[in-house]
Amino acid sequence: PDKLNFVLYARGQVLALDPGITRYGVPLHSGWYKTTLAHNTLVVDEANQKPAEGKCLAFGDEGGVEFVVAEAGDIYDGVRFVRSIALLDENVVVVIDQVRCGGERLLDVALHLRGQWVNLPDGSRWTPPNKDGYRYLREATVRRLEREAVIQVRPKEGWQIATALLTDAPADLITALGIGNHAEDLVPMLMVRRRASALTLVWGIGLDGQPIALSWRPVRAEPPDAMVAAVEVRLPNGKVCTFVANPDRAMAQVTLPDGTVWQTKAIFGVRR
């Protein structure tokens, strides 16, 4: 139940991890390791994904940016989930998640990052539901994510990573400690939660600890109901890159920072 889960490896260490498995018969086997929440992906209505056949929509290299776009398939009834991942350089990874539902659903997108929290923003205590995956979360807190935030984790002494988040509408940002290789191997988890029929979420992971500035760019699409998102990524060195995630291959018109209009039908477009 882990369609579109991803693993991030850098500097000799797994950062965004896959939980793996434990011994059969141990409650953690089905209660945590085999749950969707234990992976870096989408959970709907606090239930595990159904078995499904996902597919790769596109991959390649454009403007020096390596990217891949994949669709999860029929993981939940009436839900479409597309994830685009772009590698800008050895220190910057951008993930764009696009979710569409036939009606209002409870949407959770989780990211598990090894390390320790650094200056975690204040939040209120959050009591996880007594359901597989969720019941094993510890020290859970919640705060409102109006549009954007930056969360930092220290994988080891002398190394921090910064994760910037950008949502298309307010959501809850839940932080907690999940499980790694065993019950006492605690791993920080970020989870963006919204009850809605749609969600577009961007993760910008700075492996050198420098926050990445994320913002939306105005975009028009034909047809108007196509799944399209345009995001501006501003790197710590001042360089700017604009991405379009366009899995429907709609005619997308993006207004760039200089006022010019960029037209593209690419599944994933890049402007630097």
Model-derived segments and spans:
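Internal mixed beta-strand/loop scaffold within catalytic domains of large alpha/beta enzymes
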Residues: P1-Y33
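CBM-like, beta-strand-rich accessory domains located in the C-terminal region of large
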Residues: T22-R272
